[in-house]
Curated annotation (Swiss-Prot):
Organismal lineage: Bacteria, Bacillati, Bacillota, Bacilli, Bacillales
Pathway where this protein functions: Porphyrin-containing compound metabolism; protoporphyrin-IX biosynthesis; coproporphyrinogen-III from 5-aminolevulinate: step 4/4
Residues marked Transition state stabilizer (site): D75
Keywords, in A-Z order: Cytoplasm, Decarboxylase, Lyase, Porphyrin biosynthesis
Protein's UniProt name: Uroporphyrinogen decarboxylase
Annotated GO CC locations: cytosol
Reaction(s) catalysed (UniProt annotation): uroporphyrinogen III + 4 H(+) = coproporphyrinogen III + 4 CO2
Amino acid sequence: MRSKNDTILKAIKGESTSHTPVWFMRQAGRSQPEYRKLKEKYSLFEITHQPELCAYVTHLPVDNYQTDAAVLYKDIMTPLKPIGVDVEIKSGIGPVISNPIQTVKDVERLSQIDPKRDVPYVLDTIKLLTEEKLNVPLIGFTGAPFTLASYMIEGGPSKNYNFTKAMMYRDEETWFALMNHLVDISIDYVVAQVEAGAEIIQIFDSWVGALNVKDYRYYIKPAMNKLISGIKAYYDVPIILFGVGASHLINEWNDLPIDVLGLDWRTTIKQADKMGVNKAIQGNLDPSVLLAPWDVIESRLKDILNQGLNRGKHIFNLGHGVFPEVKPETLRKVTEFVHNYTAK
């Protein structure tokens, strides 16, 4: 049995590491040929509902790319179906919900979640990975209340989130009832993942950049504080928060009791430090760069890694998820470069 690679856990705490840890959002699936073969036969939900298949997909990038963490293969919509949300993942579109939330009565009809009863396949996958002696920490995750709510209100992906914002401004009773419900189910869902063996949790707030600071502070931040504090009340598990196009919210995020602040590619590590970020930082190569020639990739890698080495407490990642078009050998080469360039 290989010894446990806990580099990412050390980096989060600010402890000395042998190299900068690296993993990639959406590293499990998408660009992997083995995964594409599975998708010819199974849907996303079918894979995530079969622990053996899901564990296999989760483990692949650790073996193929030598990443310093595994991220559980599943969708942020996973906990919504059991509470009464009729959600379907449609190819080329994303999550589509046939019963969007419109009134407080719609929120009241939502049930609570019992992870052991409602999503046993998620917990069984985590346990299976633990039993298989996964040699890196496993990252579990959940969607943030705003991002989950936006899907539930809009009925699917949106560019402007008009219905979501309209509810916030017009019907605070329904909005805050939905926020509180999503916080409650997310705490239970995350705690169950940790109890099953997840050692790090990432909260994806993918669409929160659509809000200005004032609205975030009033409509979202209390729920985020409640969610993160609620998880920490059970287990002091490291929590990463990531959003897209939300650099204007960095100061608000820095106030939250998170351990790691995830940056997209629009904000440099230096800029985040100048804004007073005192957490570990994760990021933040533009995923598009992975489609460029290697000399361009290497130049961008050096720039990001040098900024990370200067501040410490840095986890290398992309500024969003891996594109399906990215070649597996590119990801393997990036991981190798990060490890070698930052070796101490």
